[in-house]
Structures are given as C-alpha cells and as structure tokens.
C-alpha cells in the first residue's frame, strides 16, 4: 500500500511518525518536496537506517513555503509532474500542512486529491490544534480522500483525544517523540496494526 503522511501544520511531527512507521513496518520512504536542510530523508536514515529512501520529488535550498522557494531559486517545475516511486509499500511524506502550496497553482491536498492514495493525518498538542485538526479532517472528507487515522504526537492528552474521537469519529494513534533507543515502540506498532491491518515484520 502507498500512504500519504499529511499534517495539520508544519513541525507537527510528520517526519518523526514517518521514521517510526518505516522502522516498525519496513516501508520505503519518499519526501514529496524538501525545503531546506537538514533534510527529512537524513532524519529517516538516522532513526531507521534499514529503510529504503528515494530521492526527494523536488529539492529546494530555501527553508520556506515551496512556491516561494521556487521563485527565489528560479526553478522550473510543475507540482503535478512529480512522479511517485514505484514501490509496493511506500510512505509519502508531504511538506507543511494540507494547504501548503507546492507551486503557484497547487497545494499538497490538491496533489493527494489527484493522485489518490489513503492518508494518515499527523498532529500534535498545542492551543488551537483541535480547530486545525477538525478543519483538516473536513477538507479530506469533502474530497473523498480515505483518511486512515489521526496520529497525535507528544504526551497523550486524553480529554483532547476523546473530544476529537467523539466529534470526528476517527481512530487516534498516539506516538511520543522518541530517540534512537525508543523508536521501536510496541504500543504504537500494535495500534497501527490493529487499525490498518499491517503485517508486523
């Protein structure tokens, strides 16, 4: 299965989740657009060294919204020309949030909507995150994009999780930020396996 990893915002933990997912389920990894360094692929290589990592779809030197980096660096690319690697089990990490621009005409959610694959939405706990989560879920539902689960990064907030589950009727998976010694997480692995019916290696 090919799966998109989308976020409610930038810096919510998409790459942390991607590293844990790839390490626990032997998935390959592809970053759709990389803006700036150090790269997310380098993070994956550090925490999940056995993961096959494909070259980024687009690489930008500028650590900014891709459409701005494209202009600043005078690059010529079209978002919809990015070709996804031919891999049976592939995690495709998007950049920023669902409505982060890819170029002058398209956002991340446009790409997901056109090149349909199921999606995992990643969020973390902060003031205002419930609003961002529900808006993101609604945007995916309106486009009939298959949302597999919501992953909440960081120390678990039971009250927030309960509200989101009751309101949005979506399964929630919890994953704390980790280091090299805790990336192989039994609870995370079992939660993912139960929801997605993934084969545990």
Curated annotation (Swiss-Prot):
It is an enzyme of class 6 (ligase). One of its GO terms (cellular component) is cytosol. Its cofactor is Mg(2+). Pathway: Cofactor biosynthesis; biotin biosynthesis; biotin from 7,8-diaminononanoate: step 1/2. The keyword ATP-binding applies. Its EC number is 6.3.3.3. Its main location: cytoplasm. Keywords: ATP-binding, Biotin biosynthesis, Cytoplasm, Ligase, Magnesium, Metal-binding, Nucleotide-binding. Mg(2+) binds at residues 15, 40, 93. ATP binds at residues 11-16, 40, 93-96. CDD domains: DTBS. It comes from the Bacteria. GO terms for biological process: biotin biosynthetic process. GO terms for molecular function: ATP binding; dethiobiotin synthase activity; magnesium ion binding. It is found in: Cytoplasm. Homodimer. Catalyzes a mechanistically unusual reaction, the ATP-dependent insertion of CO2 between the N7 and N8 nitrogen atoms of 7,8-diaminopelargonic acid (DAPA, also called 7,8-diammoniononanoate) to form a ureido ring. This is ATP-dependent dethiobiotin synthetase BioD. It comes from Campylobacter jejuni subsp. jejuni serotype O:2 (strain ATCC 700819 / NCTC 11168).
């Amino acid at each position: 299965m090919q799966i998109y990893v989308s976020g409610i915002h930038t810096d919510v933990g998409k790459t942390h989740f991607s590293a844990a997912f790839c390490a626990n389920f032997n998935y390959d990894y592809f970053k759709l657009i990389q803006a700036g360094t150090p790269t997310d692929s380098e993070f994956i290589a550090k925490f999940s060294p056995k993961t096959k990592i494909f070259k980024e779809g687009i690489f930008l030197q500028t650590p900014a919204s891709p459409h701005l980096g494209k202009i600043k660096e005078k690059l010529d690319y079209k978002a919809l020309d990015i070709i996804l690697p031919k891999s049976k089990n592939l995690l495709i990490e998007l950049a920023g949030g669902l409505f982060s621009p890819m170029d002058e005409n398209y956002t991340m959610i446009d790409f997901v909507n056109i090149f349909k694959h199921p999606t995992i939405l990643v969020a973390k706990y902060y003031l205002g995150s419930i609003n961002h989560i529900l808006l993101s879920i609604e945007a995916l539902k309106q486009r009939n994009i298959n949302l597999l689960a919501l992953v909440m990064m960081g120390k678990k907030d039971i009250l927030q999780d309960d509200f989101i589950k009751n309101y949005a009727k979506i399964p929630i998976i919890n994953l704390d930020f980790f280091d090299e010694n805790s990336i192989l997480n039994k609870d995370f692995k079992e939660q993912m396996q139960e929801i997605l019916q993934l084969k545990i290696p």
